Swiss-Prot record:
Entry function: Involved in the negative feedback regulation of the light-activated signaling cascade in photoreceptors through a calcium-mediated process. Interacts with tetrapeptide ligand located in C-terminal sequence of 3 key components of the visual cascade, tethering them and forming a macromolecular signaling phototransduction complex.
CDD domains, sorted: PDZ1_INAD-like, PDZ3_INAD-like, PDZ4_INAD-like, PDZ5_INAD-like, PDZ8_MUPP1-PDZ7_PATJ-PDZ2_INAD-like
One GO BP: protein localization
SMART domains listed in its UniProt record: PDZ
Species: Drosophila melanogaster (Fruit fly)
Protein name: Inactivation-no-after-potential D protein
Domain (PDZ): residue spans on this chain: 17-106, 249-332, 364-448, 489-577, 584-664
Keyword match Repeat: yes
Biased composition (Gly residues): 141-155
Keyword flag Phosphoprotein: yes
Localisation: Cell projection, Rhabdomere
Keywords of this entry: Calmodulin-binding, Cell projection, Phosphoprotein, Repeat, Sensory transduction, Vision
């Protein structure tokens, strides 16, 4: 609804009232900014201006608002000198209706602004939404009466215009915030949309993807759909591309041996970029899904294609990893002629040039290998007595996908995907393998006899058994290497010197299932030996089992603080991954007071070397000697110099939050017999 007051300002500035009703809509559809308009070289007008209008919104449908209009009052409150945030708050408080007093400029000023290179603030915002400015000649009813009342003023304004030089109304409003803020939109997403991020499933997507779209609380409550691996739900897709019609999510499983059968085209207008479906091959991978010529592809697997060239989109399709393809499309109207070419109806008939290979070589087999940066094979050009010249597998990378798929050294390479390599030279064959992406289909021929293959397998198994026996041979304790998840006996030379470790464990300790090293002092004998690490589980010392369930913490500590004559033997178990627990502890620290902890630095944080008697941590008893503080007030301590850690502890006041790491070993020693 639009009502005109019938007032007209100087130089053709029209002042009118506009009432907007957003019933059934998400927002009023106006974007505001505080700025200024230069009336002349010496005067300027400041205030709140309309920076953008959302298509199909109440502000757009009323037809009487345009980019660059100045808001004088809102619901009767003067906003000429108000801040941008204050006006936003007023609009949010206004419920479903707002009354705006608008000051707009006549068309002559607008035309002059178009030719003025300094008017970028006005024109960029205008072009962003492709607004078509409507004239005031269509006013009816109350509008006509308003024009009659203001006729004298309008004539006076025209006379003044003829006698004065044309006014330069350059709109120089600048945004105060980094992102556009729609005045009545709650929980607006103002994050940086450049670059890429990873989804919860571990897939990399564009920040601007619908999978990264932010939903407010109400939208989250309504969205019952589970996110897929790219973060997609239809609610997020519809919000990200709310200006597009008939949005669809299309999923298809790709077959490496079958082409997609998709032809792409660009926009008819060379000033615009888009990726349209020009044609779909009925025999291709997309022939059975809901996609047809004229559809605009806006995303694929989290890669945004909207406003991108179709040639770039083609490269994106080729580089997409995985067997699953998820596309977001917008179905255009049948008479929409945005696509630059006519729909393609005929595709060349696909011929499988590899079929004859199986007729010529009945024992040939197909192997599919996922290429993750490399295939893991090396090839040579050689000659075989039975099949002649060709490309052969000369080497395999151990543990590669090719080895796991069954590729063997000596196999003859007959084809890569749809390309036959029977008559290829070395350069052609390696070029095919380098260009292949995703899942690579190879046709191979094993030329060795079954007896030779069995003999090779037997030799490999024998080699593995010998290696296993070699591992099982007892090692010399003085030089024994500590291997993960195995009990290893080592001998440590101490020569009456301190071992230099802090351990956790004891029946009156928080760790009751084993004795674990939590700190190694750099000047001790353990550090000099260089084999033991923090979180190593010590099962016995000098043949005496350390069963902490029957030993006090003091007794366990004494075992490691005793001065041994020459050497000490330890049975060590190194768990991989380490057996740990993490928890948070909150303490209160008064200004000028200490925390009551004696700390020693290590590579993952600070180990508690001692608790000062009478201080809060010792009384609270949540912490103990040997605990490792890995975070302090949210700051990770891993890798920080001890001076920095000390400064963090020293400078803290009030409530202090710490993340503590404590060993939690599996019970590996038996209780002593009574």
């Amino acid at each position: 609804m639009v009502q005109f007051l019938g007032k007209q300002g100087t130089a053709g500035e029209l002042i009118h009232m506009v009432t907007l009703d957003k019933t059934g809509k998400k927002s009023f559809g106006i974007c505001i900014v505080r700025g200024e308009v230069k009336d002349s070289p010496n005067t300027k007008t400041t205030g709140i201006f309309i920076k953008g209008i959302v298509p199909d919104s109440p502000a757009h449908l009323c037809g009487r608002l345009k980019v660059g209009d100045r808001i004088l009052s809102l619901n009767g409150k003067d906003v000429r000198n108000s801040t941008e945030q204050a006006v936003i708050d007023l609009i949010k408080e206004a419920d479903f209706k707002i009354e705006l007093e608008i000051q707009t400029f006549d068309k002559s000023d607008e035309q002059q602004a178009k030719s003025d290179p300094r008017s970028n603030g006005y024109m960029q915002a205008k072009n962003k939404f492709n607004q078509e400015q409507t004239t005031n000649n269509n006013a009816s009813g109350g509008q006509g009466m308003g024009q009659g009342q203001g006729q004298g003023q309008g004539m006076a304004g025209m006379n003044r215009q003829q006698s004065m030089q044309k006014r330069n109304t350059t709109f120089t409003a600048s945004m105060r915030q980094k992102h556009s803020n729609y005045a009545d939109e709650d929980d607006e997403d103002t994050r940086d949309m450049t670059g890429r991020i990873r989804t919860e499933a571990g897939y990399e997507i564009d920040r601007a993807s619908a999978g990264n779209c932010k939903l407010n609380k109400q939208e989250k409550d309504r969205d019952k759909e589970q996110e897929d691996e790219f973060g997609y739900t239809m609610a997020k897709i519809n919000k990200r591309y709310n200006m597009m019609k008939d949005l669809r999510r299309i999923e298809v499983q790709r077959d490496a041996s079958k082409p997609l059968g998709l032809a792409l085209a660009g926009h008819k207008d060379r000033q615009k970029m888009a990726c349209f479906v020009a044609g779909v091959d009925p025999n291709g991978a997309l022939g059975s899904v809901d996609i047809k010529p004229g559809d605009e592809i806006v995303e694929v697997n989290g890669n945004v294609l909207k406003n991108r060239c179709h040639l770039n989109a083609s490269a994106v399709f080729k580089n997409v990893d995985g067997d699953k393809l998820v596309m977001i499309t917008s179905r255009r109207k049948p008479n929409d002629e945005g696509m630059c070419v006519k729909p393609i109806k005929k595709f060349p008939t696909a011929s499988d040039e590899t079929k004859f290979i199986f007729d010529q070589f009945p024992k040939a087999r197909t192997v599919q290998v996922r290429k993750e940066g490399f295939l893991g094979i090396m090839v040579i050009y050689g000659k075989h007595a039975e099949v002649g010249s060709g490309i052969f597998i000369s080497d395999l990378r151990e543990g590669s996908n090719a080895e796991l798929a069954g590729v063997k050294v000596g196999d003859m390479l007959l084809a890569v995907n749809q390309d036959v390599t029977l008559e290829s030279n070395y350069d052609d064959a390696t070029g095919l393998l380098k260009r292949a992406e995703g899942v690579v289909t190879m046709i191979l021929l094993t030329l060795k006899s079954e007896e030779a293959i069995k003999a090779e397998k037997a030799a490999e198994e024998k080699k593995k058994e010998e290696a296993k026996k070699e591992e099982e041979k007892p090692q010399e304790p003085a030089t024994a290497e500590i291997k993960p998840n195995k009990k290893i006996l080592i001998e440590l030379k101490v020569e009456k010197k301190p071992m230099g470790v802090i351990v956790c464990g004891g029946k009156n300790n928080h760790v009751t299932t084993g004795c674990v090293i939590t700190h190694v002092y750099p000047e001790g004998q353990v550090a000099a030996d260089k084999r033991l690490k923090i979180f190593d589980h010590i099962c016995d010392i000098n043949g005496t089992p350390i069963h902490v369930g029957s030993m006090t913490t003091l007794k366990v500590h004494q075992l490691f603080h005793t001065t041994y004559e020459k050497a000490v033997t330890l049975t060590v178990f190194r768990a991989d991954p380490p057996e740990l627990e993490k928890f948070n502890v909150d303490l209160m620290k008064k200004a000028g007071k200490e925390l009551g902890l004696s700390l020693s630095p290590n590579e993952i944080g600070c180990t508690i070397a001692d608790l000062i008697q009478g201080q809060y941590p010792e009384i609270d008893s949540k912490l103990q000697r040997g605990d490792i503080i890995t975070k302090f007030n949210g700051d990770a301590l891993e890798g920080l110099p001890f001076q920095v850690c000390y400064a963090l502890f020293k400078g803290a006041n009030g409530k202090v939050s710490m993340e503590v790491t404590r060993p939690k070993p599996t019970l590996r020693t038996e209780a002593p017999k009574a």
